[in-house]
Amino acid sequence: MDYYSSQITKLIEELSKLPGVGAKSAQRLAFHIISMPKEQVERLAGAITDAKNNIRYCRECFTLTDQELCPICSSSGRDHATIMVVENTRDLAAYEKTGKYQGVYHVLHGAISPMLGIGPNDIKLKELMQRLQGDVKEVIIATNSSLEGETTAMYISKLIKPTGIRVTRIASGVPVGGDLEYIDEVTLLRALEGRVDL
């Protein structure tokens, strides 16, 4: 990219490192940022820096938050006896958009994938098992319906069954290989309502 200044080239290169942003999209974003008013660029840069410096894991469910406990875990209006296990914070947000689920969550931050070298110790399973020491009555497994998601669901089910806690899996309706964050709210709600015991 010798036809751009080194500063523009550097911005395009950094933007293209973001997931889902190819070279052309990075170029469009770079030129858009450059054309923005300075104050707006500073707010954007500040928001990114603040998020990076202040966002952490909720100490209970491991979603991303800027407080010790996320708003869901700290809410007395939620059913803390029901835990929905999801792969990532985006999946949690997808279920929250339905407005119907009133339990709490546990975010694994991944799924078991032997092909990628991700085992049970690489995701938040130990922390899930520690949470089950309380008054939990049901664990709803809402991992993606991919091979990795199904593997993770079966592994979790085998871990929890001996405890006597009810273990359910969201119903199909979520397409095989589908990522929850891209599924519409009605489909997610039907999958939740049609969950089955494992």
Regions found by a protein language model. Give the residues of each.
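Cys/His-rich Zn2+-binding cysteine-cluster or related metal-binding knuckle/ribbon modules and their
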Residues: D2-I8, K17, Q27-L92
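Solvent-exposed alpha-helical segments within well-ordered globular domains of core cellular machineries
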Residues: T9-E13, Q27-F31, E42, G46, ...
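Conserved phosphate/pyrophosphate-binding and hydrolysis machinery centered on Walker-type P-loop NTPases
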Residues: P19, K38, A51, T63, ...
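Extended interfacial segments that mediate partner engagement and assembly in macromolecular machines
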Residues: A26, S75-T143
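Core recognition of P-loop NTPase motor domains used across DNA-transaction enzymes
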Residues: Q40, A45-I48, R59, P71-I72, ...
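Long C-terminal interaction/binding lobes of large macromolecular proteins
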Residues: M129-L198
